[in-house]
Amino acid sequence: MKVILKVDVKGQGKAGEVKNVADAYAKNVLFKKNLAVEATPGNLKAFAAKERRAEEAAEEELNEAKRLKEKLEKETIAVTTKAGEGGRVFGSVTSKQIADALKSMGYKIDKRKIELEHPIKALGFTKVPVKLHHDVVATLNVHVQEA
């Protein structure tokens, strides 16, 4: 019997693949555990349409990330902090503080997407990479100022 796998099934294949399996295995295991559906022409069409929608959504997400990258790279993010003599910052500027500054500017970016190799410990301008999408990385200009 031909089935369309809904999820990855060990020993059978990955989600979305059409596989030929024994009738009893299909009925007693795959269908009961909702791991697969029978590969009828209607189900094949529905699955193809679902895949197309997922691809379109992924493409739209990528385009949105590229647009956001263009906007962010034109901005300078100002972060104020206490500093001592010689431009040394008390403590450090972390990704959370940068995310909060972005939020106050109207951008919603998770602090985990800001890829600081190490916290910023000096006043001035610093370039900080932000991973917006697995294919899109923006570079922020962060200006650390004395409060």
UniProtKB/Swiss-Prot annotation:
Write down the InterPro entries for this protein, in alphabetical order: Ribosomal_bL9, Ribosomal_bL9/RNase_H1_N, Ribosomal_bL9_bac/chp, Ribosomal_bL9_C, Ribosomal_bL9_C_sf, Ribosomal_bL9_N, Ribosomal_bL9_N_sf
The GO annotation for biological process reads:
translation
Q: Which Pfam families match?
A: Ribosomal_L9_C, Ribosomal_L9_N
A molecular function (GO) held by this record is: rRNA binding
> What are the annotated GO cellular component locations?
ribonucleoprotein complex; ribosome
Question: What UniProt keywords are attached to this protein's entry?
Answer: Ribonucleoprotein, Ribosomal protein, RNA-binding, rRNA-binding
Q: Which NCBIfam families match?
A: L9
Family classification = Belongs to the bacterial ribosomal protein bL9 family.
Functional summary from the UniProt entry:
Binds to the 23S rRNA.
Q: What PANTHER family does the annotation carry?
A: 50S RIBOSOMAL PROTEIN L9
What protein am I looking at? Large ribosomal subunit protein bL9
Source organism per entry reads: Exiguobacterium sp. (strain ATCC BAA-1283 / AT1b)
